[in-house]
Regions:
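Catalytic acidic motif of RecA-like/P-loop NTPases
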Residues: 22, 36-37
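Conserved D-loop/post-Walker B switch-helix segment of ABC ATPase nucleotide-binding domains
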Residues: 27, 41-49
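Charge-enriched, short contiguous segments at helix-coil
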Residues: 201-242
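Extended helical coiled-coil dimerization/tether regions that scaffold
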Residues: 1-3, 19, 23-26
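Catalytic Walker B motif of ABC-type/P-loop ATPase nucleotide-binding domains
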Residues: 26-34
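C-terminal intrinsically disordered, low-complexity extensions immediately downstream
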Residues: 181-210
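C-terminal lobe/lid and adjacent interdomain/linker elements of RecA-like ASCE P-loop ATPase modules
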Residues: 46-159, 169-187, 191, 222-229, ...
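Conserved ABC ATPase signature
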Residues: 1-16, 37-39
Length: 242
């Protein structure tokens, strides 16, 4: 007798349910509560694709705390042109549950979403600039720069490393190694200069009294944001050509 692992049991149960739903002609809404366990590394992508396929002709609601699975859902939904309504249920700062936000949390957002958020936040900083004290302005620009720095890091992982090595299965995709061959020295210099600049702006370490630090102006911030967006477009192009 063979005993199924927890992940295999979850996958088998989900497969049975999806088969049953497939033959249901009512097209009623389907709700999944954390359909993938942490053990289902090799099945996440297949399950996400099947759930998205189901969502093409009925409402599908998915509750999950698995960010990798969420990423797979979004990826397959984009491929299939299936619209997504983003919502996050979380606790407030006093640990009371039930706060609902009409977007994914920052750590779950992809590079494109983060870039859009950073552009909106920069517009607010520009608008408030003249009414802020030096310290208040430095705090706002430091937080913004920290998130831009994180977006660079996310881009390197998601658009370079994870395209070559599947993080859920650790499978290496040899053909996509071509992405690395297309990255030029200019690309590296662009990344290094921008990442170094925004890391300096971010409040990660105490600024020495001997170092006369001046927070970046909005034009400098916009330049670095545009540099990231252009780098992202180039690296996506490399991936599409591989």
């Amino acid at each position: 007798m063979q005993v199924l692992s927890e992940g295999e049991q979850t996958a088998a149960g989900l497969a049975g349910f999806l088969t049953e739903v497939y033959f249901d002609e009512s097209k009623s809404a389907v709700i999944f509560d954390d359909p993938m366990s942490s053990l289902d590394h090799q099945r996440r992508s297949n399950a996400a694709a099947r759930i998205v396929e189901l969502a093409q002709d009925r409402q599908v609601i998915v509750f999950t705390h698995d960010l990798i699975f969420l990423t797979e859902l979004v990826k397959h939904a984009n491929y299939a042109d299936v619209s997504i309504l983003e919502q996050t249920i979380q606790r407030n700062v006093t640990k009371q549950p039930g706060m609902i936000l009409d977007e994914f949390p920052w750590k779950a957002k992809d590079v494109k979403k983060r870039t859009g958020d950073l552009r909106e936040d920069l517009a607010r900083i520009k608008k408030q600039q003249d009414s802020l004290s030096v310290d208040a302005y430095e705090i706002m620009t430091s937080d913004w720069a920290g998130r831009l720095s994180e977006t660079w890091e996310r881009m390197i992982r998601s658009e370079v490393i994870y395209r070559i090595v599947d993080r859920s299965t650790t499978e290496v995709k040899p053909k996509l190694v071509r992405i690395l061959a297309q990255i030029t020295d200019d690309d590296y210099q662009d990344f290094d200069a921008s990442y170094s600049a925004v890391s300096t702006w971010a409040r990660r370490h105490d600024k020495s009294e001997e170092f006369s630090y001046v927070a970046p102006d909005p034009e400098e911030m916009e330049y670095e944001l545009n540099r990231l967006a252009e780098w992202y477009a180039r690296i996506k192009g490399y991936a599409n050509n591989s």
